[in-house]
Swiss-Prot record:
The chain crosses the membrane at residues 120-141, 150-172, 197-225, 249-271, 272-297, 420-440, 451-473, 505-531, 555-575, 576-598, 613-635, 636-651. Keywords: ATP-binding, Cell membrane, Chloride, Disulfide bond, Glycoprotein, Ion transport, Membrane, Metal-binding, Nucleotide-binding, Phosphoprotein, Potassium, Potassium transport, Symport, Transmembrane, Transmembrane helix, Transport. Residues 1-119, 173-196, 441-450, 532-554, 599-612, 652-1085 are cytoplasmic. Homodimer; adopts a domain-swap conformation at the scissor helices connecting the transmembrane domain and C-terminal domain. Heterodimer with other K-Cl cotransporters. It comes from Rattus norvegicus. GO terms for cellular component: membrane; plasma membrane; synapse. This is Solute carrier family 12 member 4. Belongs to the SLC12A transporter family. K/Cl co-transporter subfamily.
Amino acid sequence: MPHFTVVPVDGPRRGDYDNLEGLSWVDYGERAEREDSDGQGNHRENSPFLSPLDASRGNDYYDRNLALFEEELDIRPKVSSLLGKLVSYTNLTQGAKEHEEAESGEGGRRRAAKAPSMGTLMGVYLPCLQNIFGVILFLRLTWMVGTAGVLQALLIVLICCCCTLLTAISMSAIATNGVVPAGGSYFMISRSLGPEFGGAVGLCFYLGTTFAAAMYILGAIEILLTYIAPPAAIFYPSGTHDMSSATLNNMRVYGTIFLTFMTLVVFVGVKYVNKFASLFLACVIISILSIYVGGIKSAFDPPVFPVCMLGNRTLSRDQFDICAKTVVVDNETVATRLWTFFCHSPNLTADSCDPYFLLNNVTEIPGIPGAAAGVLQENLWSAYLEKGEVVEKHGLPSTDTLGLKESLSLYVVADIATSFTVLVGIFFPSVTGIMAGSNRSGDLRDAQKSIPVGTILAIVTTSLVYFSSVILFGACIEGVVLRDKYGDGVSRNLVVGTLAWPSPWVIVVGSFFSTCGAGLQSLTGAPRLLQAIAKDNIIPFLRVFGHGKANGEPTWALLLTALIAELGILIASLDMVAPILSMFFLMCYLFVNLACAVQTLLRTPNWRPRFKYYHWALSFLGMSLCLALMFVSSWYYALVAMVIAGMIYKYIEYQGAEKEWGDGIRGLSLSAARYALLRLEEGPPHTKNWRPQLLVLLKLDEDLHVKYPRLLTFASQLKAGKGLTIVGSVIQGSFLESYGEAQAAEQTIKNMMEIEKVKGFCQVVVASKVREGLAHLIQSCGLGGMRHNSVVLGWPYGWRQSEDPRAWKTFIDTVRCTTAAHLALLVPKNIAFYPSNHERYLEGHIDVWWIVHDGGMLMLLPFLLRQHKVWKKCRMRIFTVAQMDDNSIQMKKDLAIFLYHLRLEAEVEVVEMHNSDISAYTYERTLMMEQRSQMLRQMRLTKTERDREAQLVKDRHSALRLESLYSDEEDESVTGADKIQMTWTRDKYMAEPWDPSHAPDNFRELVHIKPDQSNVRRMHTAVKLNEVIVTRSHDARLVLLNMPGPPKNSEGDENYMEFLEVLTEGLERVLLVRGGGREVITIYS
């Protein structure tokens, strides 16, 4: 959280100005006791230097402390008014907000909007756990361990978990790069990669979530019909080959029934789904804990689940009870049911027995030997099977011979061909669900903190569970039981349930409810994702799915989701649906990593993630891993998924989604540049994509050398913005005569740019007047979308001493041009004191004085400077001014929130400026400014006299300011010898001999001038702000502050220059910043 303090600023010190006729000192101590105080010891607006009319204007009379900025308040508001709007910020989308307001309007009263209140645990960690743990853990992980072996199973888990962990790191960077409104992962991807990629990936994520609902429903049906209620099956096999088809048909019928019921539940109300979410999560946690307890118990008291073996083949034990060929009953050997199945007759002399049955012995082995039995070593290695192959145990004696084909149904056989790649595709859905936290971003109290911490902790937790489960299963369960997918060899028990304590039913019931809950969650989330895509209107034919019920529920999207999920139900095989699901999720994760890598490599100014533990190499590794997993698990599914995504991309591009969200080689570069420039012509960039495109206006000396090369140094230190840099200059004269001179100047500037490491372009124009040439550069530099949006302009040093008013007229006219063109303006003052690229500031501060808000340039520039090695170690401080009517405490809170969302690390200080009286010093300085202005216009001074006059004024100002700012205590008795007198006073004038050749007839009127009221107020603003700034920032490495706009009336231009001089007096390095009238920094992702 940013550090902030409140600094009260006292009024100016008392001085002795008795030589000013008609002025008297205002005693603040006495006036505070009078009726014209505000009751808190603060002086009212009354002043001997302002007319009562101005003081009585009330709200129309703007704060005297900020009078310099009063002409532009409509476009550059006070900071306090901007910060107040942050309190009403909401994460809700527009439609949801309107719906909430409509609901809260019942009875004519609006309820207060409920603020997001979820923390990391409830908002991210537990939902991620619930979405990651799913049907694969309970139904397929044991089979995967038995088939791939412990070592390869650990490798599969490691690859999949690394993929999601790397994706979570990339996602955390994107999610913390600004406020993520309700919309989650789709919002992040689409706003990072643009509408084409966003739409394609969004639809892939939607299809993945929809097929996830189908997978969870199929898992629930498998648990129901296999372990809970097998008699509930509708279809039964009529022959040996009808077993699989009967199972699939049962899955289709019951799956459709379950899907219809769940869709109705979601349609009736999501609140019911959310209410049961905690119950479903509890089922998952209890089931997992029972597995661990059972594993520990098996070490000293293994559960009894015997497995019947014929030779080394595993028998399906759901059709017989006694594991023997014959039994002795009443001293008579009788055939068992097992004999009857293999010999098709209870007669012990039957000659139609299966040869393998006759030649091999029937034995019984423990299905759960326990952790102390040493089966881990046997289960280390893989045992991949082809479809229809019998599950065998290595090490048991067996006489190999061909058995009868009819007997195959009596063994435990593989229902699908298995390999490492197949298992990767089946297991990957068990690590998906990492987006659950970001999908709830609108409900989180602090999404930028909760999403990274909660998601990564959930992935670490689930990964540890998977790793430990693989080792636990391999150490406790017999290999043939592990390879028995449906538990046929252990009397049709769920294999993982055989290990659980106290009963297999804990796992059976828990896994059933957890899969049902996960299915409901998927059916709830997928329609909302489709609705978000439809509302963005990037895919026109999906527009209808953006509408819903009156309460905003996505009815049409839910209907489409149910129809697509039905396609997954009709596939009817969990092992076939899982790879499809993997493809869509891997596609989504691939583009999340791509988005992070692209943003990191481009280093756009808006890329400021609060989560710091990311790197483009990690994102690239995650992207490569996703792509590899897609082709490893199922190359043809991967191609289909990529074709679908590509078709969606081209369709959105073809439709022209106008959304704002982001030698031979030379010929190729030219073609690419032309294509890029044409694409950039669409309009101004989105705030997130804004970066400073600089036009640096240089002044050349008589030898065509750059007069202030540090302007180029400063521009190079802003190169972290990765924007365009154009360096321009003007040669005064005729183009026909000065063309060669312009070419030479251009080459000189290019050489200097190379020395200062400025990457950009140079343009020198020839014009009859410098100000016209500068106006041409401002208007015409750049090409297409690659145009400058910011102008760097040098300060006109020595304007006071110059006998030519064009010295400062050119400067002010250029300021007006940039304002008219809606360009930002940067004016580095005292540029000679700016650091070179070889210097390093090992400590210090960059101080930002945020007086009025004009687009956020003041915030963005220090961030860009601190990316450069010169300024890297400097810390950022932001000062803002609170007036008497501002709530400074609330401003502190709002500013802290604002900076947090901007992802800027800075100390914050709120400076309280009381509306004190305008001091005699201010009045005198204004008077002298106006007198000097008139004198220089009226008197025909020689150059020597004018230089002396300007130097005297400058010396007097500097001495007076130093005395005022750095005196520790007030001096009540200032002697006459210590007084600083005006250059032109009544006494001085009367004492001098009259010479009509040196003075105008109306000079005697100058000493009777009363300064303009608005000039007094503006001078008061400059003096007060300068006192505060020098007091707080005199030791800062750089001070940035708002540059007041020039007066609308050009007659006050010279006074405007004086105001700027007073405002920046006593500061070593100042950067005056004037925004271009648009936002350049945003809190959004």
